[in-house]
Amino acid sequence: MPSSSLAIRESPKLLKAQGSLLIAEPMKGVSYGEVVEVVLGSGETRLGQVIDVSRDATIIQVFGGVSDIDLKISKVRYRGETLKLPVSIDMLGRIFDGLGRPIDGGPPIVPEDYLDINGSPINPASRLPPSEFIETGISAIDGLNSIVRGQKLPIFSGSGLPHNRIAAQIVRQARVRGKEEKFAVVFAAIGVSYDDAMFFIENFKNYGALENAVAFINTADSPVIERIAIPRIALTAAEFLAWKHDMHVLAILTDMTNYCEALRELSAAREEVPSRRGYPGYMYTDLATIYERAGRVEGKKGSVTQMPILTMPNDDITHPIPDLTGYITEGQLVLSRQLWLKGIYPPFDILMSLSRLMKDGIGPGKTREDHRGVFMQLYSAYAEGVRLRELAVVVGTEALSARDRKYLEFADRFEKEFIGQGEYERRTIEETLDKGWELLAILPEDELKHVRIEHIRKYHPKYRGKTSR
């Protein structure tokens, strides 16, 4: 962190240490979010951040805890600046902790700049609508819930579901179409266990995923304030690569539930009045300051796309965290415990998932001309198959017509062959759409009401490769 141009001031007196908070006497000129140095009697220095200022006291969140701080001999120095991240193009291929410090054994970053981790809001008049397709290599996303550059599309998961494996797969496989386009992934693991942290680190290293990626890892035993800072630090790096180096950046943030739990813990320590289920009333606004940093800006070649991942407590999609996230973001990808128990990976619940901006990123020149019709037909056929599956439980399959049994066959194969794919299997959008046509061939042609006749003649396996094509 650069030295501040402002004079460093010392707090006159420390009043109390509580949890991870340090309470100091009020001091004129101290501002919210200001970085502080806590100097212990031993000479050790810890970073902290001002989280509340009042007439009676200044409350400081300390990185590293306050249990061993002697209030009589320790000092607090106010730096007169907010938390800044040293950024450089050399961050690509590196792994950092929750405060942006290298943890991969490599040399320190030689910064091109120091950027405020809170960023600056994008002028709404300067925003460009998301419109270009990002290929993740996962059929359930690319074919049916396409993500486009500048979008924010979360994954709603549950405890025990394979969201970490999916996140690692997307980091390995994601790319943009077009040889001249520069693409990078910024990955942030928030409050994960040591085992999960090692899974991500080893996975990225072993499969070469770090070549065009930056990883920030925050473990569960790190200070709470780090979990508040890490998504902002990751997005600061993403914005630097996008706006300064014209890269299309996909930012994956997992697990945002841990972030919200840290927000609740910090709110309780400050003795704030709780809102729904104990979370602070400003959680919606706080989440918006993170999610709204995605987008495309007029006059800039790069873009920031967000894919936050969160676990729904008790698989409850009405819980405040997924509920508020859904209000801010542009759709959701929902993981299904039922499909996971069937042995299907990745277990995306197609009927519960939605990408609101998909229509702007598919079609001729973006994916393929038949994409819209294929995804509508697959949705329709799968929904009908699920409905008939429930009916068959009551009346038995023998009572169903030949048409109905075709839809049952389609639904079963759709889950196994289209939604399901290998953890290290990457499908191009063309392979995904061709796989969709293979499954649609199960149904009679007169049932394909959502696809154009000319697309049937061109892509249907019955006609594919014939001269009429």
Swiss-Prot record:
Keyword Transport: yes
GO cellular component annotations of the record: plasma membrane
A Pfam cross-reference name: ATP-synt_ab_N
GO MF, one example: ATP binding
GO BP of this protein: proton motive force-driven plasma membrane ATP synthesis
The keyword Chloroplast is assigned to this record: no
Keywords of this entry: ATP synthesis, Cell membrane, Hydrogen ion transport, Ion transport, Membrane, Transport
Membrane topology: Peripheral membrane protein
Domain of life the protein comes from: Archaea
Cell location: Cell membrane
Main location: membrane
InterPro entries: ATP-synt_VA_C (IPR055190), ATPase_F1/V1/A1_a/bsu_N (IPR004100), ATPase_F1/V1/A1_a/bsu_nucl-bd (IPR000194), P-loop_NTPase (IPR027417), V-ATPase_su_B/beta (IPR022879)
Family of this protein: Belongs to the ATPase alpha/beta chains family.
Described function: Component of the A-type ATP synthase that produces ATP from ADP in the presence of a proton gradient across the membrane. The B chain is a regulatory subunit.
Subunit structure, as described in the record: Has multiple subunits with at least A(3), B(3), C, D, E, F, H, I and proteolipid K(x).
Protein name: A-type ATP synthase subunit B
